[in-house]
Amino acid sequence: WDEDHIPDQQSGMVNDSKSIEHSDTDSAKLVNTKEVNGEKHHIYELNFGCIGNNSVRVNYKLNGEDKFTQFEFNVLDKLSSTIETHSDFVATQTQDNDTSSPTYGIYSDWYFASGKDSTQRSHWGDDWSHDNINFMAMKNYLDPKASEVESIEEYLVDFMWNSYMKNSHDTFAVANYLSDSGIYGGGANPYSRTYSEVMEATGFFNMYRIEKAYPNLINYRKSAEWYLEKAYGIYSNRVSASPIGFYGEQQIPDMIEALYAEGLTDEGDNLKVLFA
């Protein structure tokens, strides 16, 4: 563990105060009835048997006619538990681990009803799976788990750099859709959106920070500097302040400091010019 690079673990960084304990069974208990301006208000205590979406239907009569009102509650577990559960699910369930697959290493989109997205070749982009790497990398920078960091390596090295971006190593373009990527396309400048490229750049940068903070966590396949170079390459070639406003810019000061720390002074100066 490298104390100089481990992020501050502030108490309260993950706020569990809004979570509730769910019971084994659903229940509704009338606890009080109040009359306000001539109207009766019945107050119930609700216990939900599962996390996620819960529907509550209240049946009543109005002027002798049957009526109902339906409420929708999204019940959360503790946020810390939810984050851990989600990162484990992304790594163990959504990632393509078939080494013979063209999308080996991808974090696929997932639907509750049908599982992995079977149409991701045409639907994949800045509004879809590009954001999964941001969650996984930042979570493991703050709370590392060896198997998940190995999963991130598989995504960034095998999938993103070696396959998805294989035709754009010089341009650093990140295709917005899977169908236009190096896996299925041949161009060095595929259709892209800056939002997609920022997501991948921050994924690479946070992997750099993971390796700097926890150098002995796993046997890393690439150096920390390798990931920093990819993050810088995307930002310097594909991103600027004008088209996306403040999207993703919160990490640029940290990236500039990292470039200087690694002796990449010209690169750090260049990002300053681009985003000052």
Q: Model features per residue range: what roles?
A:
Residues 79-276:
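Catalytic cores of extracellular degradative/oxidative enzymes
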Residues 2-82:
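Extended acidic/polar, glycine-enriched regions
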